[in-house]
A protein has these predicted regions:
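Exported/extracytosolic protein signature
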Residues: 1-184
Length: 184
């Protein structure tokens, strides 16, 4: 009686975190032509990998059209939380959303940022044409146009690239002048 050989095969699946970050504009008070308004952006960090990972520092960099002036900024973990959030301070024009948070495999974390904005047609470089969003040669939203805003992730912390890290909303001025003409 001879024993049959047994072949064992082990398959080791590579375990790794896989972080991605994306941004969207969720509320644009400037779309109706208001001079002073709020604009809300949602940032979502997701771990699509099989191991927990830290998001690393996530920052928010608005680059609005000239004349769209930020009066204040608030950061919260929910859109409703923005109403009671304290004012955030920018460092060199960049707001810190988080210094890093641990995300379990398959987990997501939301951050919200709200800017109170005033449209100032007297600002240097103001152009109504720049109040609309536009795209650059890579078909990505262009900075310095409309309510352009970008979330920045640390190197290696955004597996799906930066093209979905940009959001923009237009502002539409509704300034008009009525001239009356009459005869007697």
């Amino acid at each position: 009686n001879e024993a049959a050989p047994i072949t064992c095969t082990f398959v080791n699946e590579y375990q790794a975190p896989k972080l991605r970050v994306e941004k969207s504009i969720e509320a644009n008070g400037g779309a109706n032509g208001a001079t002073s308004f709020n604009v809300d952006y949602k940032i979502v960090a997701t771990n699509d990998g099989s191991l927990a990972a830290n998001t690393g520092k996530l920052t928010d960099k608005p680059d609005f059209a000239k004349g769209l002036e930020i009066q204040s900024a608030k950061i919260a973990e929910t859109q409703a939380g923005l109403d009671s959030a304290s004012n955030a301070t920018a460092t060199n024009g960049v707001y810190t959303l988080t210094d890093g948070v641990e995300l379990a495999a398959g987990a997501s974390k939301e951050y919200w940022i709200r800017f109170a904005v005033t449209r100032n047609p007297a600002a240097a470089g103001y152009s109504e044409a720049d109040l609309a969003c536009s795209v650059n040669g890579n078909n990505e939203k262009a900075p310095g146009k409309g309510l352009f805003n970008e979330v920045l992730a640390e190197n290696g912390k955004d597996s799906d690239g930066t093209s979905n890290n940009k959001a923009c909303g237009p502002t539409v001025p509704h300034d008009f002048v009525v001239i009356k003409a009459g005869t007697q």
